[in-house]
Amino acid sequence: MNFKYIVAVSFLIASAYARSVQNDEQSLSQRDVLEEESLREIRSIGAKILGGVKTFFKGALKELASTYLQRKRTAEDHEEMKRLEAVMRDLDSLDYPEEASERETRGFNQEEIANLFTKKEKRILGPVISKIGGVLGGLLKNLG
């Protein structure tokens, strides 16, 4: 009789333990689900805020770019425009990270070519413009 009693109590303890483990697993999975849902909500809120900030910066940068385009640009303005364009590319790369490296490489190559052309242009046009300016200055002096 003692043996039957020990087996019955052991069985009850084992089943109670199994139920408690099962309940713990369920509560953990429910907690995980709740945590995951709250993380999703936080991420979506963060994504919305980031999207709003990106939209604001894109609009502000486009406004600055249009302001610079409507007036005569100096070398400093040109450099500032390059920086603004780089920032715009960076903001766009946040939307499409896989294409960013391709776009960046393509932009760098085009920018490098433009810089080389500008340097050649300055070397050729600098002396020509100074000679033309000297000739025009001499003509104006003779006419005046």
Swiss-Prot record:
One of its GO terms (biological process) is defense response to fungus. It is found in: Secreted. Belongs to the bombinin family. Keywords: Amidation, Amphibian defense peptide, Antibiotic, Antimicrobial, Cleavage on pair of basic residues, Cytolysis, Fungicide, Hemolysis, Secreted, Signal. Its main location: secreted. This is Maximins 5/H4 type 3. Maximin-5 shows antibacterial activity against both Gram-positive and Gram-negative bacteria. The only exception is the resistance of E.coli. Also shows antimicrobial activity against fungi C.albicans, A.flavus and P.uticale. It has little hemolytic activity. It does not possess a significant cytotoxicity against tumor cell lines. It does not possess a significant anti-HIV activity. Residues 1-18 form the signal peptide. It comes from Bombina maxima (Giant fire-bellied toad). Residues 19-43, 74-123 form a propeptide. Disulfide bonds: none annotated. Expressed by the skin glands. The modification Leucine amide is found at L143. Transmembrane segments: none annotated. GO terms for cellular component: extracellular region. InterPro entries: Bombinin (IPR007962).
